[in-house]
């Protein structure tokens, strides 16, 4: 079995799709079933898996500004959408006996053995959670990928069911390959977490944590409204810590963040380096993730793996990931989210149960399983 794997998602800042691509390709590189693995980046082959450098938050801000600039160039975006897959196809013209895997939706034109990973299809089901330019670009590109793909991988049973429901694609050619998190995400002692806590001026189990892109789909505005319903004494004792690079703008959200920051119960850390995240999770009192829509929900799995209680939404893929380990609520029910957050902060009996259940639930997910499921799916071609 000979594979060409597209490495474009492996870049700073490393998103959930980037993490999936990195962890999967590392394991494919040593899998005995893979006779040869070639790495494809942009429109050319590369010799090594890209290195994700740790960079300052200034660089993350620059990334956000560059993305904003590109969104204002519709002709440039459309030209790229039309030309890039053709450039890729030309570079791949002599590799017809290879399976090509695009881990981030997109595929070159007219490949005979093409595999794509669809992480979610919120562009089609919830376009209001995305910038209009992204919707226009991805709707066209995803339909082209559907036309080209001989096999679709997806990351949850929920996402698979959505693809089956919305698209006329052979059911037997849609495979679920569930995600996992790094082995760095484990329970840790206060002493182990101390350097990171000191770096960010935080206290052991002295905060609630959100990790993820700061964008409307994540329902951060609802999270802030729910947190604001907690008694001020509780908010000051357990401030809400937000981490993640800025997605597309939401002026109301940032007004709420600034207000909470002035009042002392919110802190926005920006994009936190990968090496700090396991400690930031492990030292948290609770993890909160009331997202409107997820294809998987990797941060929930990371939190459970660290032994941290979870409060999340009861929609899309999140119940599939959290199982019976967390408190779940309708993402539109601010009162219920607030009540669950309060319980996760104060109810020690529930917290003990949630920690044990979360650790057990997290063990069901591993990158080894994801890799095995992926290779088994390749065999369908």
Region roles according to the model:
Residues 1-381:
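Carbohydrate transferase catalytic cores enriched for Leloir-type hexosyltransferases
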């Amino acid at each position: 079995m000979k594979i060409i794997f597209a490495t474009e998602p492996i870049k700073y800042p490393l998103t959930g799709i980037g993490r999936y691509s990195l962890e999967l390709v590392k394991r494919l590189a040593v899998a005995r079933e893979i006779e040869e693995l070639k790495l494809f980046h942009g429109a050319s082959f590369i010799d090594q898996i890209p290195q994700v450098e740790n960079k300052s938050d200034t660089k993350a801000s620059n990334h956000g500004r560059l993305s904003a600039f590109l969104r204002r160039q519709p002709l440039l975006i459309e030209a790229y959408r039309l030309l890039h897959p053709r450039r890729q196809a030309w570079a791949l013209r002599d590799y017809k006996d290879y399976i090509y895997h695009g881990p981030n939706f997109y595929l070159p034109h007219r490949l005979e053995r093409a595999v794509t990973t669809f992480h979610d299809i919120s562009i089609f089901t919830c376009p209001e959670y995305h910038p209009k330019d992204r919707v226009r670009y991805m709707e066209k590109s995803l339909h082209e990928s559907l036309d080209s793909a001989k096999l679709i991988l997806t990351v949850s049973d929920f996402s698979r069911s959505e693809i089956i429901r919305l698209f006329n694609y052979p059911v037997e050619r849609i495979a679920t390959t569930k995600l996992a998190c790094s082995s760095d995400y484990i329970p840790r002692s206060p002493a182990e977490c101390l350097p990171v806590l000191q770096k960010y001026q935080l206290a052991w189990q002295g905060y609630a944590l959100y990790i993820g892109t700061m964008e409307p789909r994540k329902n951060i505005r609802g999270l802030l409204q729910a947190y604001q319903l907690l008694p001020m004494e509780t908010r000051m004792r357990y401030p809400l810590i937000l981490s993640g690079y800025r997605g597309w703008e939401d002026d109301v959200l940032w007004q709420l963040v600034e207000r909470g920051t002035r009042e002392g119960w919110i802190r926005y850390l920006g994009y936190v380096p990968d090496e700090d995240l396991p400690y930031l999770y492990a030292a948290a009192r609770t993890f909160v993730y009331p997202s409107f829509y997820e294809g998987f929900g990797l941060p929930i799995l990371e939190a459970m793996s660290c032994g941290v209680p979870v409060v999340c939404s009861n929609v899309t893929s999140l119940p599939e990931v959290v199982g019976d380990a967390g408190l779940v609520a309708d993402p539109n029910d601010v009162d219920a989210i607030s009540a669950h957050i309060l319980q996760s902060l104060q109810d020690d009996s529930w917290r003990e149960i949630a920690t044990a259940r979360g650790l057990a639930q997290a063990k069901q997910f591993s990158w080894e399983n994801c890799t095995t499921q992926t290779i088994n799916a390749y065999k369908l071609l």
